[in-house]
C-alpha cells in the first residue's frame, strides 16, 4: 500500500504587488500595479500601469503603502481582489493622509 504524505495546501490564486493610490471608499482600496514589458519591434522597455480595486476588510492600508493583493471571487462590479498583506508602510503620517482625503 502506498503511503501518502500530507502537504500544505498551496494557493493557486494570482498575486500582485502594488502601490495604494486611493482609500476613499469604505473597505475598498485602489492599488496601482506597474509592470515592465519589452516592445515587440524595438526592444525598448516600457512601463505599464493598471489599477485594481481590492477589498480591505480591516481598513489597514493607507495611501502610499506597498501591498500584496490576491485574486478572489467577485465581491462587486469592480472588486475581484483582496488585500493579503501590507508590505511597506508609507512615509507619510496617518494624520497627514486623513487631511489629504
UniProtKB/Swiss-Prot annotation:
GO terms for biological process: translation. SUPFAM superfamilies: Nucleic acid-binding proteins (SSF50249). Pfam families: Ribosomal_S17. GO terms for molecular function: rRNA binding; structural constituent of ribosome. The keyword Metal-binding does not apply. One of its GO terms (cellular component) is cytosolic small ribosomal subunit. Disulfide bonds: none annotated. Coiled coil: none annotated. Keywords: Ribonucleoprotein, Ribosomal protein, RNA-binding, rRNA-binding. Part of the 30S ribosomal subunit. NCBIfam families: PRK05610.1, uS17_bact. Belongs to the universal ribosomal protein uS17 family. One of the primary rRNA binding proteins, it binds specifically to the 5'-end of 16S ribosomal RNA. This is Small ribosomal subunit protein uS17.
